Regions:
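Conserved glycine-rich cofactor-binding loop
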Residues: 12-13
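Conserved glycine-rich Rossmann-like NAD(P)H-binding loop of the short-chain dehydrogenase/reductase
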Residues: 27-42
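Rossmann-fold cofactor-recognition segment
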Residues: 49-64
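Substrate-binding pocket helix/loop in short-chain dehydrogenase/reductase
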Residues: 95-108
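A short, exposed helix-loop element centered on a Lys and neighboring polar residues
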Residues: 119-120, 164
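Catalytic loop of short-chain dehydrogenase/reductase
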Residues: 133-158, 164, 168-172, 186
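C-terminal helical subdomain
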Residues: 172-181, 199-242
Length: 242
């Protein structure tokens, strides 16, 4: 039986790992990448302990030649990429006068340029098969700019409209392109450590986003029949103001 391959770019310890596990539990061969691939060992052990198949790689998604080579190697040696998730983005907060060109450019590279490279390269293969799903992770900053978030908001807005343009171009060719707006705080150790009072307050009333529940929406998007595709969804806790 031909492998079902799910590619997760930005398989961090929280949402990226949850997405990887979700697809592995559904029978997908998971290929995951992050800048430091050694940090994928716990994820690999978890998936393989449950009988799943996992490949982990070190990759800087901003490096064009590396991304091109990486996608080609997956297609040639592991299997056809059925679904690709781009889950990379640098959330930084600086006032406009404190935002250096380096900070702005790096944020754009991570959130937007890397998304473009990944989307372009997987699309080349999906177009030949006339099928596939590409999902981009967005944020509150994708739809509105916040005080101190000029770099992050600019990059996330750009990613959102990259996704929309790709959806309009690739949809008629059988490729489902979706954008997920994460409009709320995710339940992570990082949030707990830095904002302990906030964490405890929200956690007690189910006001933090569970990475596993978010991940289920990515799988749902991928499994949608093509007569009823969703391009964009926004996910938030029930108490989040919007």
């Amino acid at each position: 039986m031909e492998k079902k391959v799910a590619l997760v770019m930005g398989a961090g310890d929280n949402l990226g790992s949850a997405i990887s596990k979700c697809f592995a539990n559904d029978g997908y061969t998971v290929v995951a990448a992050r800048r430091n691939g050694e940090k994928l060992s716990p994820l690999k052990d978890d998936i393989e302990s449950k009988g799943g198949v996992f490949y982990g790689y070190s990759l800087d998604a901003r490096k064009e030649d590396d991304v091109v080579k990486f996608i080609k190697e997956i297609e040639a040696n592991i299997g056809a990429i059925e679904v690709a998730i781009y889950n990379i983005g640098g959330n930084i907060k600086f006032g406009i006068t404190e935002t250096t060109s380096q900070k702005y450019y790096k944020t754009w590279e991570m959130a937007t340029f890397g998304a473009f490279l990944t989307g372009r390269e997987v699309a080349k293969h999906m177009i030949k098969r006339k099928s596939g799903t590409i999902i981009f992770t967005g944020a509150t900053a994708s739809v509105r700019g916040g005080d101190g978030y000029s770099a992050f908001s600019g990059a996330k807005h750009a990613k959102r409209y990259l996704a929309q343009s790709m959806a309009r171009e690739l949809g008629p060719q059988g490729i489902h392109v979706a954008h997920v707006v994460i409009d709320g705080a995710i339940d992570t150790p990082w949030i707990k450590e830095l904002f302990n009072d906030f964490y405890n307050e929200k956690k007690g009333i189910d006001g933090l986003m569970n990475p596993n529940d978010i991940a289920n929406n990515y799988l749902w998007l991928h499994k949608q029949p093509r007569n009823a595709w969703t391009h964009e969804i926004d996910l938030r806790p029930w108490i989040e103001k919007w």
